[in-house]
């Protein structure tokens, strides 16, 4: 385990927050890399345009099925994001959340709270290595088709977000042999958790 420093995104008055004992990306099990096992997630945030609002989406992608979840949250505080992630993933059966890989943003400062509540392990990508959680980054890009950069996300209704996520999860993907993430996710939920 290493020590991790989170840096506030503000340009002036940076306040590093030292987080001890984080798990680096390279410590993940091989089953996470090769996508053979269900229940490994990637997490990130999609933010509003500069100066528009503090509202953002907490996003989660299951690596094997490419199933995607986005939750609108009022700000990027660690406590806010932790509550949203716990609320979304705690609805799933035990065994559906084994690991979560995220970046080193300050919004993940409450990672131990997430681990404890979900019974999973969290791993942190290396700085400036977005490819280490590429599934989530790719899906965030697809979400931007509905909510382009610069958009005030505080104005997005939960119903509209839910509808757009349903469209994304119902889109057949070549990487999944033209199966839909929603269908695969439901299939693996039944297999792993019954």
Positions of PLM-derived features:
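Conserved short alpha-helical interface segments
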Residues: 1-19
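Mobile genetic element proteins and their domesticated derivatives, centered on retroelements
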Residues: 3, 44, 60, 66, ...
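Mobile-element integrase/transposase regions
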Residues: 13-56
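Active-site beta-loop-alpha junctions of metal-dependent nucleic acid enzymes
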Residues: 49, 53, 70-94
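Extended hydrophobic
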Residues: 55, 62-63
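Polytopic alpha-helical membrane proteins, predominantly small-molecule transporters/carriers
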Residues: 57, 67, 94, 121-125
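Acidic/histidine-rich, metal-coordinating catalytic segments
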Residues: 95-110, 128
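Charged alpha-helix within mobile-element recombinases
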Residues: 115-194
């Amino acid at each position: 385990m290493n020590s991790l420093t989170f840096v506030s995104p503000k340009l002036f008055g940076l306040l590093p927050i030292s987080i001890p004992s984080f798990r680096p990306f390279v410590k993940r099990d091989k089953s996470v890399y090769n996508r053979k096992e269900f229940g490994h997630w990637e997490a990130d945030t999609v933010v509003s345009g500069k100066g528009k609002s503090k509202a953002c989406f907490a996003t989660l992608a299951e690596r094997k099925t490419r199933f995607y979840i986005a939750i609108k949250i009022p700000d990027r505080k660690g406590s806010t994001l932790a509550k949203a992630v716990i609320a979304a993933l705690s609805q799933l059966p035990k065994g559906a959340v084994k690991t979560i890989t995220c970046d080193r943003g300050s919004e993940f400062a409450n990672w131990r709270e997430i681990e404890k509540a979900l019974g999973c392990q969290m791993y942190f990508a290396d700085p400036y290595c977005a490819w280490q959680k590429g599934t989530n980054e790719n899906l965030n890009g697809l979400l931007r088709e509905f909510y382009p950069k610069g958009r005030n996300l505080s104005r997005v209704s939960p119903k509209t977000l839910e509808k757009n996520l349903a469209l994304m999860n119902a889109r057949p993907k070549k990487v999944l042999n033209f199966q839909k993430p929603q269908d695969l996710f439901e299939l693996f939920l039944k297999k792993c958790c019954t």
